[in-house]
Amino acid sequence: MEGKEEDVRLGANKFSERHAIGTAAQGTDDKDYKEPPPAPLFEPGELKSWSFYRPGIAEFVATFLFLYISILTVMGVSKSTSKCATVGIQGIAWSFGGMILALVYCTAGISGHINPAVTFGLFLARKLSLTRAVFYIIMQCLGAICGRGVVKGFQQGLYMGNGGRRNVVAPGYTKGDGLGAEIVGTFILVYTVFSATDAKRRARDSHVPILAPLPIGFAVFLVHLATMGITGTGINPARSLGAAVIYNQHHAWADHWIFWVGPFIGAALAAIYHQVIIRAIPFKSRS
């Protein structure tokens, strides 16, 4: 019967947590960190506070800069008659990943999401309120639309001639293929975000907060390398929305649902996996 009791309790409270070899956690107490309390669904009075709007403005600016630089890079590759004379696929992937790395580093102290899927995943994990999540997503979408609009203004002919570099399922792939690629790609990104910002890891390894943008940027880079040939790599609904709004012709909206449904499913799966499997937070005592 004792074994069955352990199965029910999952061992979450009976055994002390083990520390990885070589980390700063060796020789510390069983729990040397404090789990932040769950965010309320609605926070009274937050709409009247300037601290509510500052992160939203940061999300707008960061998403604007993200799309501005990355899509300009794509346009530069498309413009050249010789792909060998450009940064190529790897350069495009790194422009997306590198900008995320830089912008997360710059804005992590205030928000640092730059992606509705990331915001949605963190909301499901009770890291922010519903009102903040909705506000962040709106500002991210507006930033993406403006960023795309500026790029189109610089070189409208090239932009429209290349289909606005919108996200679509590539020929030879089904909508199911595209949806699957978006789910898995977003899962990788959001899972990396959870791991890089984990409260326990941040407390036990002092260098983790400084290095957190690095794995997040590399996750974006690697997912782009893997899925650019399938969907153009969405994994960010704001980015896909900005492309559809600014281009707005020739089936710009045909596969658009994939780039919202896929990332949101991937983000939800990543949130559940990290909170339930990796951290076992629902099974820990509330003492």
From Swiss-Prot:
Function (record text): Water channel required to facilitate the transport of water across cell membrane. Active as heteromers with PIP1-2, but not as homomers.
Compartments (UniProt record): Cell membrane
Tissue specificity as recorded in UniProt: Highly expressed in roots, shoots and developing tassels, and at lower levels in leaves.
Motif (NPA 1): 115-117
Any Gene Ontology biological process: response to water deprivation
UniProt free text on domains: Aquaporins contain two tandem repeats each containing three membrane-spanning domains and a pore-forming loop with the signature motif Asn-Pro-Ala (NPA).
Family: Belongs to the MIP/aquaporin (TC 1.A.8) family. PIP (TC 1.A.8.11) subfamily.
NCBIfam families referenced in this protein's UniProt entry, alphabetically: MIP
Effect of residue 249 to R: Active as heteromers with PIP2-5
Gene3D superfamilies registered for this protein in UniProt: Glycerol uptake facilitator protein
Location of the motif NPA 2: 236-238
Major subcellular site: membrane
Molecular function GO labels: water channel activity
Membrane topology, as annotated: Multi-pass membrane protein
This protein's name: Aquaporin PIP1-1
TM region positions: 57-77, 92-114, 134-154, 176-196, 210-230, 258-278
Induction: Expressed in roots with a circadian rhythm showing an increase at the end of the night period, a peak during the first part of the light period and then a decrease.
Complex formation: May interact with PIP1-2 to form heteromers.
